[in-house]
UniProtKB/Swiss-Prot annotation:
It is a multi-pass membrane protein. SUPFAM superfamilies: Preprotein translocase SecY subunit. It is found in: Cell membrane. GO terms for cellular component: plasma membrane. PROSITE patterns: SECY_1, SECY_2. This is Protein translocase subunit SecY. Keywords: Cell membrane, Membrane, Protein transport, Translocation, Transmembrane, Transmembrane helix, Transport. PANTHER family: SECY/SEC61-ALPHA FAMILY MEMBER. The central subunit of the protein translocation channel SecYEG. Consists of two halves formed by TMs 1-5 and 6-10. These two domains form a lateral gate at the front which open onto the bilayer between TMs 2 and 7, and are clamped together by SecE at the back. The channel is closed by both a pore ring composed of hydrophobic SecY resides and a short helix (helix 2A) on the extracellular side of the membrane which forms a plug. The plug probably moves laterally to allow the channel to open. The ring and the pore may move independently. Component of the Sec protein translocase complex. Heterotrimer consisting of SecY, SecE and SecG subunits. The heterotrimers can form oligomers, although 1 heterotrimer is thought to be able to translocate proteins. Interacts with the ribosome. Interacts with SecDF, and other proteins may be involved. Interacts with SecA. The chain crosses the membrane at residues 19-39, 69-89, 122-142, 157-177, 189-209, 219-239, 275-295, 318-338, 378-398, 400-420.
């Protein structure tokens, strides 16, 4: 398999892109260890050691920052503000006609939407940075740590402002690094950085499981988790590649003396058309009420109920609500990201039709019917995969931050497949055989 990658490094321009991407990744990983002023890192390290994998509410964000969040470094916020901004803009595109018109304007419209995404990313970085600093100052960032209140010794406003500015600047640098990879490297830059952030948390999480294990000095638990992870990766690859192909034929047209059309193709409808977005939506929504309770420090009945039933990932109400939110958002996101009427109109415009289905509205209804049928198993699969860490925690007493969680595996497999396909296509353009055999 490794020899199949040799042509990628033998091709000068492709080798240059790969090395450039690796260089940016190294810079990004170095940035996750650069400290910001105003933080006592001895106390931070002590709290991280005491947490021992129990990162509570901040586990998801910490994963997307490659472990930099709980270290409170320059890249503490990672790419989470950009992900959130991109999702918000994508949703607003459906609601606001002006944004929808920009989306249809081609490259110029896409550039404008990208600019809006950058502005929103900076605003969200300021907001999230302020929240993180306030949480660290109050001692709530590490629940149960004896020195959590001493992480930020200087409580002055100026120190807080400097910390927020450093984190916001770090987010802007991360966004810039991602765009550099997209323009001059291999793959989608933000997706690559997300992939690296998640993969960077695996070694420490796996080692924590080994240290906490009891059978054969923890090696049996360690091996079991690796085996479960490999099985999950295989399952996710299988489902992510699964698709329903709708056959499409194009009628022959004579333009001058030339004949056009008469070809057959298909519309690929993936089983998991929504990707990982529903999981991120559901996690973010369940994150909000628990965060409100943590900031309020209230002991009222409503706060106790939220802490017991929503903040606790092993609680039955949390599991049920999380599963149904994922299913709901899967249908919701598919509905806004795939427009059957638009696809049917484009097919009709260029003389395409589905055999046995009339062009126009009947085609749109047929596409909508098929999409709804395949979204059901896709949404149920997403819900079950996302609940793997919870099931591992409840059934086997596993580490709360089970490294092969649904969100992380979905992102790693999705980004990995997309990047490999891009390298494969570039190799085939240069008359190489490729390595996907």
């Amino acid at each position: 398999m490794l020899t199949a990658f040799a042509p990628a490094f033998k091709t000068p321009d492709l080798r240059k892109k790969l090395l450039f991407t690796l260089g940016i990744i190294v810079v990004y990983r170095l940035g996750t260890h650069i400290p910001i002023p105003g933080v006592d890192y001895k106390n931070v390290q002590e709290c991280v050691d005491q947490a021992s994998g129990n990162q509570g509410l901040f586990g998801l964000v910490n994963m997307f920052s490659g472990g930099a969040l709980l270290q409170i470094t320059v890249f503490a916020l990672g790419i989470m503000p950009y992900i959130t901004a991109s999702i918000i803009l994508q949703l607003l595109t459906v609601v606001i006609p002006r944004l929808e018109a920009l989306k249809k304007e081609g490259q110029a419209g896409t550039a404008k939407i990208t600019q809006y995404t950058r502005y929103l990313t900076v605003a969200l970085a300021i907001l999230q940075g302020t929240g993180l600093v306030a949480t660290a100052r109050s001692g709530a960032l590490f629940s149960g740590c004896t020195v959590a209140g001493q992480i930020v010794p200087d409580q002055a406003i100026f120190t807080t402002v400097v910390m927020v500015i450093c984190m916001t600047a770090g987010t802007c640098v991360v966004m810039w690094l991602g765009e550099l990879i997209t323009d001059r490297g291999i793959g989608n830059g933000m997706s690559i950085l997300m992939f690296i952030s998640i993969a960077a948390t695996f070694p420490s999480a796996l080692w924590a499981i080994k240290k906490q294990g009891e059978l054969a000095d923890g090696w049996i638990e360690f091996g079991t988790v690796i085996l479960v992870g490999l099985v999950m990766v295989g399952l996710v690859v299988f489902v992510e590649q699964a698709q329903r192909r709708i056959p499409v034929q194009y009628a022959k047209r004579m333009i001058g003396r030339r004949s056009y059309g008469g070809t057959s193709t298909y519309i690929p409808l993936k089983v998991n058309q929504a990707g990982v977005i529903p999981v991120i939506f559901a996690s973010s929504l369940l994150y909000i009420p628990a965060l409100i309770v943590q900031f309020s420090n209230s002991t009222a009945g409503w706060a106790t109920w939220i802490t017991k039933n929503l903040a606790d990932t092993a609680a039955t109400p949390h599991i049920i609500l999380y599963f149904f939110l994922i299913v709901f958002f899967a249908f919701f996101y598919v509905a806004i990201s795939f427009n059957p009427e638009e696809v049917a109109d484009n097919m009709k415009k260029y003389g395409g039709f589905i055999p046995g289905i009339r062009a126009g509205r009947p085609t749109a209804e047929y596409l909508s019917y098929v999409l709804n049928r395949i979204t059901w198993p896709g949404s149920l699969y997403l819900g079950l995969i996302a609940l793997v860490p919870t099931m591992a925690l409840a059934g086997f007493g596993a580490n709360q931050n089970f490294p092969f969680g649904g969100t992380s595996i979905l992102i790693i497999v999705g980004v990995g497949l997309e990047t490999v396909k891009q390298i494969e296509s570039q190799l085939q353009q240069r008359n190489y055989e490729g390595f996907l055999r």
